[in-house]
Amino acid sequence: METFHTYNYFINVVLPLALPKLYTYAVPIELEQQVQPGVRVEVQFGRQKLYTAIVHSITINPPTEYIPKEILAVINR
């Protein structure tokens, strides 16, 4: 059984891939104060690939097409 969390913020990120859109990730409460546009974060994309992404924007609205994954870490502030 999967556990669902409530998040205050979500971020839209730019991935280092030839993809035509932004992807939205959930921000864990313990990382909220560290996330801002332009900051690099570590995210999982796909089943096992980890990437460094750049935060494009912050929103309170979760995506409607999919359940967002959490960011794994903030790389720089």
Predicted regions and their residues:
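Accessory, non-ATPase domains that flank or precede helicase/AAA+ motor cores in DNA-metabolism machines
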Residues: 1-77
